[in-house]
Amino acid sequence: MKLNKYFVIDFDSTFTKVEAFDVLADISLHDHPEKEERKKQIIQITNQGMDGSISFRESLERRLNLLAPSRQHLSPLINQLRGSVSESFKRNKEFFQKYADNIYIISNGFKEFIEPIVTEFGIKTENILANEFKFDQEGRVIGFDMENPLSANGGKVEQLKKLNLPGDVYVIGDGYTDYEIKHAGLANKFYAFTENVERENVKKGADHITPSLDEFLYLNKLNTVISYPKNRINVLLLENVHPVALALLKAEGFNVETYHAAMTEEELCQKIKNVSVLGIRSKTQVTAKVLESANRLM
């Protein structure tokens, strides 16, 4: 289907639930005597890069030196990332297949581990823009392509300028570098993706906060499998309802609130007003008065 809209999507903590470098650290440093110390340093360097105290390129170089990755680490990394795709992305695989020509993955991560994940959703290889490793003859990572704009500050903005997409551009991501695309005037809207992580400075600059891909598709009338986003359905669980039930509801994308004890009739009357699903145990009494207050209960 021909569509005059383009979707620019981040990878780490957006397409996947995790940061790939965090997973890579557990793999490449698994038997390293300085594993915990190096992981702490990597986090510190990442934060320094994010707050601007060091350049993104310096952050990348220093983290790779600490990680000391090689080709042999890529296969287990890819396997773990494959199992860490965001739940709402998994639910909407048809969207990626239907609009493959219009979807771009733009990431400051590395193509070697991004491509195997996103191409399984139908995303085209040529629409994946990311950094690329450089290897020595033994397969050890010795650096990255420094000519790639994504290895430096403002890389995503530079890539969007080069693409010069002929239509409306919608950016979906969790990070400040995603917001920068909109700030530079290269996107019509920026959607702060909060399914996995929430960053206040990113949310402040967003046109819309989207807790799931379902919400984004609903807002833009692109729904393929869900007619109404589950994140808009409020669920209230009282009296320490079993954690498995909580996990399953959250995995499905519902907006879940929990309370450890039972509620009085008055408390429940106030709390239930915007609740669609109520989970209780024996101590909570759902009276006629409570039901009168439940204007959204299914």
Residues of each region from the PLM?
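Conserved Lys-Pro-Asp/Glu-containing loop-to-beta segment of HAD-superfamily phosphomonoesterases
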Residues: S151-Y179
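An N-terminal-biased, well-structured beta-alpha scaffold segment characteristic
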Residues: Y228-M298
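Short, polar loop motifs at secondary-structure junctions
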Residues: K111, F133-K134, Y176-T177, T194-E198, ...
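Alpha-helical substrate-recognition element adjacent to the catalytic core
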Residues: K2-E132
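Histidine/lysine/aspartate-rich catalytic loop segments that bind and position anionic ligands
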Residues: G122-L150
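A short helix->loop->beta-strand "cap" motif at the edges of active sites that frequently abuts
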Residues: Y99-D101, A187-N188, A294-M298
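Short, conserved loop/helix-junction motifs that constitute active-site signature segments
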Residues: G122, H183-G185, V290-R296
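Acidic, Mg2+-coordinating phosphoryl-transfer loop and its flanking beta/alpha structural elements
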Residues: S107-N108, D168-P211
